[in-house]
Each structure stands twice: as C-alpha cells, then as structure tokens.
C-alpha cells in the first residue's frame, strides 16, 4: 500500500507543475493549449542535458529553459501578432511534438541517472507518514513550494492583483496604466517554465529514458485540472492526486491482468478528464466561478 501511495504522489508531480503554470497564464487572460508541446520540449531537453553533462540538475535547468523558450514562441504569435490563442496553442503542441521527436532521436534507448531522494531529517522518522511525505526528490518538494507561492502571489501581493486585473478586464487594466502585454508575456513565460519542469520530471524521476511522446497526454490533463480547480491554486493539488491515482489504477490493472481490455484501461485517465469537464460544464455556476473574464480574448494595445 505504501508503494502504491508513493507512486500516486510521484505521478502527480508533473501535473502540479504544468497545471500551476497554466493557471497563472490563464489568470492573466491567456489560454495556452500548447502545454503538451512545452512539456515534451522540457522532457527531451532535460534528458539530453543530463546525458551530456552527467548531472540531473543540469537537466532540470535545461527543461525549465526549454519550456520557457517554447512559451516565448507562443507569446510571439498570440500576444505580439494577436493571432488566435486556441489555434496558436494547438500549433505549439504539434510543433513541440515534432521537434522533441527530432531532437530526441539520438537519445532513444539511452538511460540516465535520475534525481536522488532527499530525506528531511527528523520528519522522515514520523511513523506512517514520514517516508511517504518527507523522502522525495527535490522537484517533488519544489512542486508543492511553487504551488504555495503562486497561491500567495495571486491573493496577497499587488503584482498578483495586477495580473488578475489584466485577466478580468484588459481594457480597464490598460486605462489604469498597467502594461497588459508585458504582464501576459511574463505569465505565459512562467507557465512555459513550469510545463518544462513538469516534462523534465518524467525522464529524471518517473522513467529514466527518453521515448517520443512520453508525456502521454499529461499536458491536456493539466489543462483540465485548471478548470477542475476553478482557477484556485490549492485545488490543483487535489485534482493532481486524483488524476495521478486514476493513472496508477490503469497501470495496476494492466500489471495484474484485470479482465478488462488493455485499451480500455489505457483510456481511464482521459475518460475521467472528459467526465470531469462534462460535469463542470453542466454546472454553469461552478464552471464560471473565478474564470477570468478576458480568457482567450485577443488584446491589441491602443497607441
């Protein structure tokens, strides 16, 4: 049972990273559907850097930078050229999928040494929960820390208030003297950096190898998590653990030979994602609460 819970916790980490970053981008009014592509670029960059330098911490840095740079491509078109955000995000996912496959081709079949666990003294000795909560890699701790910082930033700081104002009414924010495009560029860049970290976690912790498309739809699940969380950071943790548990059920079912077709088991995380979105959509009041009023709307700065 302990091993199962540990696996659920680890599986939720990349979702926490990616969903937290996307939440910040969406609270600024930008809908970036390219999370999957950014995660793939983060994954391949992390694996390549770790293979070349022999240091997984270089892989973390490379993954974060790759995600941020991929997000900058999105910003160039969606913010700089005012292209449709949905179409641009989908194009970014296709771009990231293709480029990551090309960059990762020489590394197929290789393995790397993953991140070591960092046990927290004294806390790890707590009965039952000590090993479950206080004996993880640095990125697992970082994901929780970033989630808490984002919640504090959005609700307790002036900069967070400005970001939310830009997402709720970019015209009013501009009239008050705020630089809408700069705020959104920063939010999208942060979202890309987080997606890159989420992607980097896959080859550095979960599976110490590179394979094309190894994110396996986690970027889309992260997008659904933001809606599930109603754009509230603390709820992302609950959603990530829920979807992580469903993913582990799928893998456990395949390993134990449940009398269910493997294709049906593989569908479980994505069917759950669709069902959650359908339930939320039917409850219109819940679906709209905390939703940024200008989400996905193009902003053209008046001269």
Predicted regions located by residue number:
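Transmembrane alpha-helical segments in multi-pass inner-membrane proteins
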Residues: 206-270
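Helix-loop-helix "hairpin" substructures at the membrane interface of multi-pass membrane proteins
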Residues: 132-210, 233-238
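Membrane-interfacial amphipathic/re-entrant helices at transmembrane-helix boundaries
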Residues: 1-18, 31, 45, 52-58
């Amino acid at each position: 049972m302990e091993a199962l819970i540990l696996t659920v916790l680890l599986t939720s980490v990349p979702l926490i990273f990616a969903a937290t970053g996307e939440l910040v981008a969406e609270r600024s009014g930008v809908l970036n559907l390219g999370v999957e592509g950014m995660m793939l670029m983060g994954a391949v960059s992390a694996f390549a850097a770790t293979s070349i330098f022999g240091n997984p911490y270089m892989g973390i840095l490379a993954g974060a930078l790759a995600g941020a740079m991929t997000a900058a491509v999105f910003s160039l078109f969606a913010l700089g050229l005012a292209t449709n955000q949905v179409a641009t995000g989908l194009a970014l996912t296709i771009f990231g999928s293709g480029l990551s496959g090309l960059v990762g081709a020489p590394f197929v079949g290789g393995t790397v040494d993953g991140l070591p666990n960092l046990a927290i003294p004294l806390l790890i000795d707590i009965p039952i929960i000590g090993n479950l909560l206080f004996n993880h890699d640095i990125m697992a701790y970082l994901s929780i820390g970033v989630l808490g910082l984002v919640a504090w930033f959005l609700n307790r700081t002036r900069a967070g208030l400005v970001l939310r104002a830009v997402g709720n009414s970019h015209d009013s924010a501009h009239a008050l003297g705020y630089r809408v495009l700069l705020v959104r560029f920063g939010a999208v860049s942060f979202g890309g950096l987080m997606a890159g970290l989420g992607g980097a976690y896959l080859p550095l912790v979960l599976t110490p190898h590179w394979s094309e498309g190894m994110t396996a739809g986690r970027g889309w699940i992260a997008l659904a998590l933001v809606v599930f969380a109603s754009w509230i950071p603390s709820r992302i943790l609950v959603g990530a653990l829920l979807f992580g548990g469903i993913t582990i059920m799928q893998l456990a079912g395949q390993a134990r030979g449940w009398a269910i077709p493997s294709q049906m088991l593989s569908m479980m995380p994505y069917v759950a994602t669709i069902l959650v979105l359908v339930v939320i959509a039917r409850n219109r009041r819940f679906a709209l609460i905390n939703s940024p009023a200008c989400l996905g709307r193009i902003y053209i700065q008046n001269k």
